[in-house]
């Protein structure tokens, strides 16, 4: 589905990753892939797993909540259909006046779209059974005649994709600290799915499916392609190849064999996008740089070349120790040897350690800047400061824009 449950963005994204062999919809920004017809056999409420956490809405209720699905309520569009902004009462979950109650995002299935009832049903059943801080909350659904709708919590910050790749005043580039926070949150969501009583393979982990709340907490959305993992003595699930080009694990593409380690590979691609600010596939780049993993893989293992991969908008925000650890983790996730890939619990542990380093670095920055402010009181007013300096901290060399006296021997 891949539609942002967030602020209205309709511009087409250049160079976005295409879909392949998939009834999965395009991302919220409308680039198109081949059509898959919707199945027409009868559908009933009996297909939906019982969940006390979900409300069954009538079509009339959602029509009222979205002001009759008015065009100016559209948040995004994709293969599933359109997403509309609406309002409901927090207690009764009935439609409320615009600007009052709880803001919701309503996905309305387009019967001529690329996704159908099975994807809709998977979304209802998985999100209806699961509750986790890093999974988007499904409030309810509507299954009435030909109508298929999903009702979610509203995610005001939009998708990670938009924050990494959009340009303009609406989306500001994410800071290094926020990127680590989002990467960790998404990893926790994926780990939760893999650790379920019957593991769940997400199968379409990508930046457009990672949504951000007002505090930049990451939440996984779009479970239309999710599958139960192998059970008993089975090592994998065999399935038709579906997903998004540039994110799928090579062994899955070659054999159709799906495991939780397939998700780990996809996570590695996203982590590389977070580190580099580049898309997994970008046809607008030079031929040798269009496929991010192929281009970056040899650079990630070389500390002297790693700077070529790191997003230049992150200049002076990170230590080399942090960057190297993120690069090493991405490489491990992207290895061709399935058994050598970490599981998502290990990924979470590594990222928590990196986040601790980042927080320690931030404290050191504050301490050094306080010291420098005290020293600056004794510096002659006519001394001209330079643009910045580098300092050694417990987590490595970190650059800062704090000015330094040009002729002071303390900074040689």
UniProtKB/Swiss-Prot annotation:
Modified residues (Phosphoserine): 208, 238
Residues bearing the modification Phosphothreonine: 58, 239, 244
EC number: 2.7.11.1
Location of the protein in the cell: Cell membrane
Pfam family, one: PK_Tyr_Ser-Thr
SUPFAM superfamilies in the cross-refs: Protein kinase-like (PK-like) (SSF56112)
UniProt keyword annotation of ATP-binding present: yes
Catalysis: reaction(s): L-seryl-[protein] + ATP = O-phospho-L-seryl-[protein] + ADP + H(+); L-threonyl-[protein] + ATP = O-phospho-L-threonyl-[protein] + ADP + H(+)
Known partners and oligomeric status: Interacts with the Xanthomonas campestris effector XopAC/AvrAC.
Known function: Possible bi-functional kinase. In vitro, it exhibits serine/threonine activity. In vivo, can phosphorylate tyrosine residues of limited substrates. May be involved in plant defense signaling. Required for full light-induced stomatal opening.
Protein's recorded name: Probable serine/threonine-protein kinase PBL10
Annotated source species: Arabidopsis thaliana (Mouse-ear cress)
């Amino acid at each position: 589905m891949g539609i942002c449950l967030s602020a209205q963005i309709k511009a087409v994204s250049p160079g976005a990753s295409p879909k392949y062999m998939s009834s999965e919809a395009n991302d919220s920004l409308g680039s198109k892939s081949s059509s898959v017809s919707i199945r027409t056999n009868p559908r009933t409420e009996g297909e939906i797993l019982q969940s006390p956490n979900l409300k069954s809405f009538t079509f009339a209720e959602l029509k009222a909540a979205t002001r009759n699905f008015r065009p100016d309520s559209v948040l995004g569009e994709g293969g599933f259909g359109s997403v509309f902004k609406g309002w409901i009462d927090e207690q009764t979950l009935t439609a409320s006046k615009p600007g009052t109650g709880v803001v919701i995002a309503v996905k309305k299935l387009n019967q001529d779209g690329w996704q159908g009832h099975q994807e809709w049903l998977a979304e209802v059943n998985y999100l209806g059974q699961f509750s986790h801080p890093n999974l988007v909350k499904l409030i309810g659904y509507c299954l009435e005649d030909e109508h298929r709708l999903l009702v979610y919590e509203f995610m005001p910050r939009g998708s990670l994709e938009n924050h990494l790749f959009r340009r303009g005043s609406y989306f500001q580039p994410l800071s290094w600290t926020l990127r680590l926070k989002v990467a960790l949150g998404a990893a926790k969501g994926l780990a939760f799915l893999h650790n379920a009583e019957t593991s769940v393979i997400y199968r379409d982990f990508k930046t457009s499916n990672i949504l951000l709340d007002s505090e930049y907490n990451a939440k996984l959305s779009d479970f239309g392609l999710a599958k139960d993992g192998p059970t008993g003595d089975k090592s994998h699930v065999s399935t038709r190849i579906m997903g998004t080009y540039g994110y799928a694990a090579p062994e899955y593409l070659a054999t159709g064999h799906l495991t939780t380690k397939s998700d780990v590979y996809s996570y590695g691609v996203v982590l590389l996008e977070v580190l580099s600010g580049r898309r997994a596939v970008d046809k607008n780049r030079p031929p040798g740089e269009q496929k991010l993993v192929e281009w970056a893989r040899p650079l990630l293992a070389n500390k002297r070349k790693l700077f070529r991969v790191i997003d230049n908008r992150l200049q002076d925000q990170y230590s080399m120790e942090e960057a190297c650890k993120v690069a090493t983790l991405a490489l491990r996730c992207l290895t061709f040897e399935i058994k050598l890939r970490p599981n998502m619990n290990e990924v979470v542990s590594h990222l928590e350690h990196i986040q601790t380093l980042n927080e320690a670095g931030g404290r050191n920055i504050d301490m050094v800047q306080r010291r420098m402010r005290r020293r600056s009181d004794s510096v002659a007013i006519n001394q001209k400061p330079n643009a910045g300096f580098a300092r050694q901290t417990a987590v490595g060399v970190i650059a800062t824009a704090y000015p330094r006296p040009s002729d002071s021997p303390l900074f040689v």
